[in-house]
């Protein structure tokens, strides 16, 4: 018989004052107290098919029995509650529900007021508490790179953000949550938030699938700190122990906690077998550190460390690596990086970024990542910034460590920049000013390569002052705009060590002179204008808005002889759709082209009427010259012809999940393509992506790039990339791998080949086993795959509906 709830407190009152009129046992359908007499926090509610009240202050519920308190609820076949001793005994089909999950078993004894007791042979389910744990053995907020702990380009990542080396995440997708279940021979409840399980097992696999689990002699769970501690624990995969530890401590929900991270291992052709053991130290809520020992079979033992700190007003990192007496070279080798960013408020900020390595071959020999092996100049710089609504100020001190021994960037010791922007009635007034002191590294050589294939021998240094005020009048309407602009560019040079010698590609001297201290003043006039037209069109059953957007940009700058002005920071801008609309074709301040030129460009777009999404954009542009080029860089021949190359861009987002991007630069005088970039991606759903790319730059680059991820059936995915240089007839990077998703665990193995700056290529082998987000064992290739295969999605993130 289903009855309404009764309340222990009122039942106690009835038993205490009405026992003279009661029988030894009393069957009752309901005891209905007055609600105002029931303090909710202390209320214990019992219900069942049959409830019995005993004179010795015991309550018994039989059939569909349950007992509820403010923190937990117990179900069972029979529930007995001793009012006087506050003891609970539940027999048969016991189910205990708490804020952390559910525990079931055959029998439970507990003191609800203190949440102490025990249960035999429990089985437990946790409310996804363990999902997304970063690494086995800890939940330190820690990212592990493929090579080490500290090659992190993002030195400003907040300490509260999950920093795991898992770049397989995709927008709009989240990691599949495991059921987080387990069992034990017994559990002891040691308070409201503490449980101790004996001979426990834990897994995130579905019921009936025990592909992997953690088996621990003792497992402690603390719901208050959200941490767990296991002793004498081992990980078993497919019934085979693969990892053992005497003690592990971890967090339920990715809170940072001190402890050992999962060891990683792999092999490379340059360093041999690698094994990394990192330890995470949670020093304070705004401060942490990671210390690692990396064993390299061909080199020795490398020590690594990273220290991070985060405050409301500042943040920073310190990264160190040290390999004493490299077995391959006999040298002590190191890498160091220190970065800090400080916000002083009121618009003021400051930062420094310092990097240094022991030798030029450090990255090419110690790293497997192509973005690292190709590094040439390491910054050693600091700056102070100020910004408000109208003004910005920057003070920069900058040096570099150059690793290739060829091109040494000039040092800025210091560089001061002040810019202003304000409205004056309908006019827009701007000011750019800069003073810089250029110096050279003591190791710098005088010979520098030129764009023309020759060399420029010089050790010129000096100081430079720039002032460029300008005024413009923006005028805009819905159908178009026009903006005339007038400016005056002033530059002053104080030159030291001005002697230079220019040689052609055969080594013959073509020019020999000396840079002079001088000043240069140039007026600059430009008009930027554009129109906007649109119409509605229908293609098949789809409605679009088609636009036509012509743009015209005119620039006039008179000629000034600049051949004896040193080149501190100027180079030629790449010709693209953006640079077609620049006043000066040179970057930096040392060269300002003479100009009497007009740029014409046309853009047409197809925009969906239903979604507003741009489906197609086509842009074509060209610059027309009305004066010969008289200003150019040393070793570079002046432009011939009265038009620039034609620039074209196409961006298409097709309805069948194809994305296509095309860039082309065509020289009309020689009827040849100077540059082509073509990329196409087919990405119909997560886990399916194919990429085809081609890059060509005349006399410099000719590469094809193929990559993809594709399901092979029954949870298997194929992975690959092939980047090949047609110019050198050799591969640049090759990747081949397999990935398997079993639902509660994933495995992936990847082989990588990377061409380095030296003649020999570097090979790396990755193997990783992910156990339901709890354990990540092996060397993590996810960042590599995310970079190498655009559109890649980790199998742990792919919804079941796509598999």
UniProtKB/Swiss-Prot annotation:
Protein's cellular compartments: Cell outer membrane
One Pfam family cited in the UniProt record for this chain: LptD
Swiss-Prot/TrEMBL GO biological process terms: Gram-negative-bacterium-type cell outer membrane assembly; lipopolysaccharide transport
Keywords per UniProt: Cell outer membrane, Membrane, Signal
Annotated signal peptide: 1-22
Biased composition (Polar residues): 134-165
Function noted in UniProt: Together with LptE, is involved in the assembly of lipopolysaccharide (LPS) at the surface of the outer membrane.
Known partners and oligomeric status: Component of the lipopolysaccharide transport and assembly complex. Interacts with LptE and LptA.
Family of this protein: Belongs to the LptD family.
Stated name of the protein: LPS-assembly protein LptD
Organism: Methylobacillus flagellatus (strain ATCC 51484 / DSM 6875 / VKM B-1610 / KT)
